[in-house]
């Protein structure tokens, strides 16, 4: 068995101390990130059982979030116009979710902020999708054009749905084709 002084000399060596400090810092950083990004196991959070149940029923089971932008195809907007209208819808949806549900916004951002653009054949379809999304409690943003360039003033151009649970949004827009 090594002598007590040899063990103490080994423990006092600078590289051993550096290793111990590095491991401790890594553990603290990992714990801080888990707390900051809400990645603690459910049993360690302060939510009650009923809060967790209602959240699961609202958010769905997949744990994935996305935003869908539905573009009216009958207006025959140019690519730049579509990009501008989709941007308006995305910013509007972001502002709403930031105010109403910052925790869901954080989850959507953690998922990489996925956005998908799909097309709807006409205004009636857009309005029906709006009603369905509202019924499911999803965030919606309907954009009306000012009419300064390509299309008539007040035309409803793009519907933003989400950010929200992907499986819930798919119930509204899953049948639509990509733009």
UniProtKB/Swiss-Prot annotation:
Keyword presence, Transmembrane: yes
- The reply on keyword tRNA processing is no
Q: What GO CC terms are in its UniProt record?
A: cytosol; membrane; mitochondrial outer membrane; mitochondrion
Subcellular location per the Swiss-Prot or TrEMBL entry: Mitochondrion outer membrane
Q: What class of enzyme is it?
A: hydrolase
**Record location of the Glycyl lysine isopeptide (Lys-Gly) (interchain with G-Cter in ubiquitin) cross-link:** 47, 76, 81, 95, 106, 115, 171, 177
UniProt topology in membrane: Single-pass membrane protein
Q: Name one GO molecular function term.
A: peptidyl-tRNA hydrolase activity
**What does the entry's PTM section describe?**
Ubiquitinated by PRKN during mitophagy, leading to its degradation and enhancement of mitophagy. Deubiquitinated by USP30.
Q: Span of the secretion signal?
A: none
Q: Name one Pfam family in it.
A: PTH2
Q: What is its EC number?
A: 3.1.1.29
UniProt catalytic activity:
an N-acyl-L-alpha-aminoacyl-tRNA + H2O = an N-acyl-L-amino acid + a tRNA + H(+)
Task: Give the family, as the similarity comment puts it.
Answer: Belongs to the PTH2 family.
What is the disorder linked to it? Neurologic, endocrine, and pancreatic disease, multisystem, infantile-onset 1: A progressive multisystem disease characterized by a variety of neurologic, endocrine, and, in some patients, pancreatic features. Variable clinical symptoms include global developmental delay, hypotonia, hearing loss, ataxia, hyporeflexia, facial dysmorphism, hypothyroidism, and pancreatic insufficiency.
State the oligomer form and interacting partners: Monomer.
Q: What NCBIfam families does the record tag this protein with? A: arch_pth2 (TIGR00283), PRK04322.1 (NF003314)
Q: What does this protein do?
A: Peptidyl-tRNA hydrolase which releases tRNAs from the ribosome during protein synthesis. Promotes caspase-independent apoptosis by regulating the function of two transcriptional regulators, AES and TLE1.
What PANTHER family would the database entry show? Answer: PEPTIDYL-TRNA HYDROLASE 2, PEPTIDYL-TRNA HYDROLASE 2, MITOCHONDRIAL
What is the recorded name of this protein? Peptidyl-tRNA hydrolase 2, mitochondrial
Q: Which organism is it from?
A: Homo sapiens
